[in-house]
Amino acid sequence: MKVFIPHNHRRCQVCSQGFFADSPICFEAVGERETLVNHKALANHEASIKSEALVKYETRAKIVPTDKAEGYDGIMQGGIVTTLHDSAMLHCLFQNSITAMTVSLTSRFHHPIAIGKELEIRAQWVKSRRSIHFLESKIIQNGKLCSSAQSQFMSSH
């Protein structure tokens, strides 16, 4: 399922343009629904109340970076890699009807990301505290973890 992009984000130069590749990124929403059981004591006997909740929040996309994203010859530029992490994590929040802005973002680089070869970006919600949301993401190419990131976002309303 494609992730919905809020109306006020439709002009984003990263999300709505071919910033990393020849066409805009199409983030896919991935979620697992699980039935959670809550126990409440009612009149001296236990009753189980079942409720369905989304327990995993994840967004992913596959792209083939072009020379638009090139830094050193044949290698994706580090700032653009970080931008890709930021975009994926934001779309993970969009998946969960949260509009937010980046507060902090830390990227780690494990292996160079080759231009012209498919990569997969995955972002996952970790937790929220009040209006701050914690997320993490990873970029995998040829089965190798090439880059990882952690971020905090602040709800915009």
Question: What is each of the regions a protein language model found here?
Answer:
Residues 1-62, 66-67:
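Non-catalytic linker/capping segments at the edges of enzyme domains
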Residues 1-8, 17, 113-115, 126-157:
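HotDog/MaoC-like acyl-thioester-processing domains
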Residues 38, 75-100:
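Active-site helix/loop of acyl-thioester processing domains in fatty-acid/polyketide metabolism
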Residues 54-60, 104, 118-120, 134, ...:
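Intrinsic-disorder/low-complexity, polar/charged segments enriched in Ser/Thr/Lys/Arg/Asp/Glu/Gln
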Residues 60-84:
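A conserved, well-ordered hydrophobic junction motif at loop->secondary-structure transitions
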Residues 62-64, 106-108, 122-124, 138, ...:
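Residue-level recognition of well-ordered beta-strand positions that form the cores
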Residues 88-120, 125:
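Hydrophobic beta-strand-centered segment that forms part of the acyl-chain substrate-binding groove
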